[in-house]
Amino acid sequence: VTGAGSGIARAVTLEALRRGARVAAVDLNTTTLEETTTLAAADGAVSTHVLNLADRAPVEALPAQVIARQGAVDGLVHCAGIIQPFAKLEDLEYDAIERVFAVNWWGTLFLNKTFLPQLLARPEGHIVNVASMGGFLPVPGQTIYGASKAAVKLLTEGLHSECAGTNVHVTAVFPGAVATNITVNSRVTIPIDDATAAAQT
């Protein structure tokens, strides 16, 4: 489970453990990942793996690490993702654009391509990629984020077609507005107008 240090991925991790699964919890943030394992109190059923999903080499090394700790890989639940600074395209720096695509697009591609052979070798496997409703309709100030999630959507749908007739199932999930730490994790602040600010004070 990627992004397991917070949000949807933390909830998925805890629920999977509650149901008796063994989970490899993946995140960039060591502190929040440790918080998840503390909440889990899973007595060895969860292993933690700290890495940057935008870096291909560590991702390619991940299956062997997970198998060494867990024995096998039967599923990938890819939740990790970030948003962009709330700004129009013309006002965005290329660094911000590239960072969103590095995590949301390349991270997804690296994980899916790396874990697919492991899953095809199992009796049954499942890939779940978390996209976003923002991949269907534009969200104000999130054009690049939406484009990255639209790419995740199409990749997942294409992989679903490619895996038809195999032992691997592929699913895309499209959350709407969910209370998570994505703004903090993305190092982004949400702009609020003066009236909203006054109402909050």
Q: Where are these predicted regions, by residue range?
A:
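The beta1-alpha1 cofactor-binding region of Rossmann-like NAD(H)/NADP(H)-dependent oxidoreductases
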Residues: 31, 50-61, 94
